């Protein structure tokens, strides 16, 4: 299988393969619209949405930390000084960024 056939991120001679949404061996199906209006179906519907949003958010955080947009202690490739610290130091040094 070629590398372009898989979801991946390429940066600085490093290829990171992305995991699919379903991390388990069984494929999950998400019902985004409850068929019936009872309370249990609505709860199941909201739980499905929470799981999708939660997994997406974790993936976004990992990608942001990899590209240096935020610091993630569990990711060794993320930038050590946060990009938010750059704004604090650049004005103190007269416009020169020493980080």
Swiss-Prot record:
Organism superkingdom: Viruses
Pfam families per the UniProt record, alphabetical: Cauli_AT
Assigned protein family: Belongs to the caulimoviridae ORF II family.
Role description: This protein is involved in virus transmission.
Name used for this protein in its record: Aphid transmission protein
Record organism: Cauliflower mosaic virus (strain W260)
């Amino acid at each position: 299988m070629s590398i372009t056939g898989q979801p991946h991120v390429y940066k600085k001679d490093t290829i990171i393969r992305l995991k699919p949404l379903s991390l388990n061996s069984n494929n999950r199906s998400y019902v985004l619209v409850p068929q019936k209006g009872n309370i249990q179906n609505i709860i199941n519907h909201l739980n499905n949405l929470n799981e999708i949003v939660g997994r997406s958010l974790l993936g976004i955080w990992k990608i942001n930390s990899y590209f240096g947009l935020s610091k993630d202690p569990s990711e060794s490739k993320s930038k050590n000084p946060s990009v938010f610290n750059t704004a604090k130091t650049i004005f103190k040094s007269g416009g020169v960024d020493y980080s």
